[in-house]
Amino acid sequence: MNWHKLFYILLAILCLTGCSVQRKIKRADKKFAIGEYYTAADIYKSCYGQLSAKKDRELKGYVAYRQGECYRLINNPRAANAYQSALRCKYQLQDSTIFLHAGQVLQYQGKYKDAAKSYELYLEAHPDNYVAQAGKYACSKIDEWKKEGSRYKISEAKEFNQRRTSNFAPMFIGDNTDALVFASNRQEKPKGGSKKLQRPSNVTGQQLFQIYQTRKNAAGEWEEIELAEGLYDGGESEQSKDSADTKGGTAEMGVCTFTRDGRTMLFTYSKPINGQDLGAKIYRSDRASGEWGEPQEVKLFLDSSITVGHPALNVTGDTLYFVSDAPGGEGGKDIWMAELDGENWLNAQPLGKGINTAADEMYPYVHADGTLYFASNGHPGYGGLDLYKATRDTTFKDSTVWVLYNMGPSFNGVGDDFGITFEGETQNGFFSSNKGEKKGYDKIYRFWLPEMEFIAEGLVTDEQGNPLSDAQLRIVGSDGTNSKFNVRRDGTYKFKLNREVKYVMLATCRGHLNAKEQWNTLNLKDSKTYTMNLALSPISRPVKMENIFYEFGRWELTQASETELLHLVKLLEDNPNITIELSAHTDMKGTDEFNNDLSQKRAQSCCDFLIKHGIERERLTPVGYGKTKPVICDKALNKKYPWIPVEQELNEVFITALPDDKQEICNQINRRTEFKVVKTTYKLY
C-alpha cells in the first residue's frame, strides 16, 4: 500500500475519532444539564479513555471533572477518583471549584485531613465562601464533637430494609403512629399485579423509587410491606406516555407528608415526558375507601419548569415547607415555605441564610412542638448530608433568625443522614442513612431518647462512720415535693428526682444533730446520680473538728482552719435551736498559765469567725481548757494507733513513758478544737 494513502487514512480515522468524542461530550453535557447524572457519567467515562493526556489535557481534565460532578451529585464514592484524574490534568487552572467539591467528597468519605487541605486551597481564591469555611471548620472539630456524644440511641430498623436496595424518608401517616410509609426501589409486585419495576433511573442508575406502606398488627409488629395502594397501576398507559400521569412504571415517587388526620398526602413525584426528565414536582392525593385517589399537582410557582419536592406540613397544616432550586435562594437546593389560602399554596419564599446555604438543604420535617428538622451538606457537619434541628430565635417578636443545632454523632457520621420523622410529640422515630454502606444504599434506622433519670442516694452515719438505721430524711423541692421517709436498716437511702427542680434534704436522728444538703436538677443534659453521704454529729459528747490549725504559740486562724469552720457555720444554720461550747486544747508543753491563755484565745478566734459569718453570739461559748482535758482513747483511735489502749487517757504520765516519736503523736492528738451541744432549745420558748 502506498504510504501516502496510509497516512491520509490514519489521519481521517483520527479526525473521525475526535469528532466522535466531541459529539459524545456534547451528549453527556446535555444529559448532565437535565439531571441524568448516571447516564452522563457513563458517557464521560468512555470519553476520558479516548483523550490524550498531552494533546487533550484541558479537555480530558474537563471530562474527568464533569464525571466527578455526576458521581458527587448522586453520592457515588467514585467521585473522589474522578476529581483526582481532573487535578492530574491541571483542571484547577480552569476552575478552582474543583477544590470545594473535592473537599466535600473527601469529607463525605471521612477523610477529614485531606478534605481540610482541599478546602484551604479553595479558600485561597474564595476566602468568604461559607460552605468552604464551614467544611474546614468541621474537619477541625470532628474529634471534639465525637467525644461530646449524644443521648439518643439508634439501631437499624431491619424490618423495613431490603438487601441491595435503598429505603429512605420514613413518614407516619398523620397522627397514626401505627402506619408508616417510605420510599424504596425494591422490586416488589404491585398488589394484584404481575409486573415488576425494572426500568433504572437515568439520574442515579438505581431502580425507580416508589412509595411503600406498612402497619402494625395487634402485637405491635410491623406487617408485610406493600406498594401504597392507588398510586401504582403496574404499567404505562397511552396517556402516561405523553402526559404527567402519576401512575405507571416510569414514574418515580419519594418523600411525602400527611395532614394530621392522614387523609391527604403530599408527595414528591418525577416522570420523564417524551424520554426527558423534567425534574420533580409535588403532588396531592386524598384517601378514600382505603386507597389513595388520583394525584393532582400542587402549584407553587407560576414557572412550571421549576423543580420542587420534599414536602413537609406543619402541625396545623397551613404551612408547607418544601425544597426547590428556584431563583431567589442561596444556591443549590434550598428549603422554602408557602402558606395555605383556601385550596392554594401562596407566597412561596425561601427560609433565608439561617437555614439555606450555597450547598443543599433538603428533607424538611416539622415536629409537633414546631421545631424544624432538615438535612444539609452546607453547614458544619460530619460530611455529606447531616441532620439539623432549627428553632426561631425568640429574642425578638416575629424574629426570622434561626438557631441551628447539629443532631450529633448518634445520627450523623460519614455519609448521608437525612429524612427524619417523629412519633407524634415524642423524641422517638425513624430516619434514613447510608452510614457504613460502601455502595451507598440507604437504610432506615429507628431512634429513641431514653428518659433522663435523676437519683439521689447515699448513707447516713454517725461521725465515726457507723450507719444510723433510725435516721429520717425530709425532701423538699421547688416543684412542691415534700416527702419524709426512713433510711434502710443499713443506713442507706435512694429516691428519684424530677427535672428542673431545686431540692433541700434534711437528715435527722434522735441524739444527733441535723444535717442538710441542697442541690438541683436544672439545665441537665443527661442522667445523673447524686451521691450524698451524711455524717450526723452526736449531741451528748464533744465533736472534734479536723483541720483547725494555728501557728506555733499563736491563735490566729489559718486559711485551712477557716475552710473547716465554714462546715460548722452550716451545721449551726441547719440546727438553729442549739447552742454550743467551742473549746480549744493544748498539749502538755508549756506552763498551765500559758496554755490556758493560748487555748482561750484560740477558742475566741473560732467564735469570732462564726459570728462574722452570721451566727448569733449568744449561741457560742468559747472555753480554753489548756492541757487539763487530755483525750481518752476510744475504739476508733485505737484502730489507728494500736499501741494506745482503749480508755487510756493521754496524760503527761502516759506520754512521757513513750518513745519520742510516739510522744509527738500523742501531743498532736491532744492539740485539738472541739464543740459540744449545750442546749437544744435556743429561741424555742
Q: Where do the protein language model's features map onto the residues?
A:
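Periplasmic peptidoglycan-binding/tethering modules of Gram-negative envelope proteins
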Residues: 452-579, 618, 640-643, 649-651, ...
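Periplasmic OmpA-like peptidoglycan-binding domain that tethers envelope proteins to the cell wall
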Residues: 376, 380-383, 585-685
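Short, conserved micro-motifs composed of acidic
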Residues: 34, 90-91, 101, 108, ...
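Single-residue signature of alpha-solenoid repeat helices
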Residues: 40, 79-80, 115
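Flexible helix-coil transition and linker loops at the boundaries of alpha-helical arrays
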Residues: 48-60, 87-95
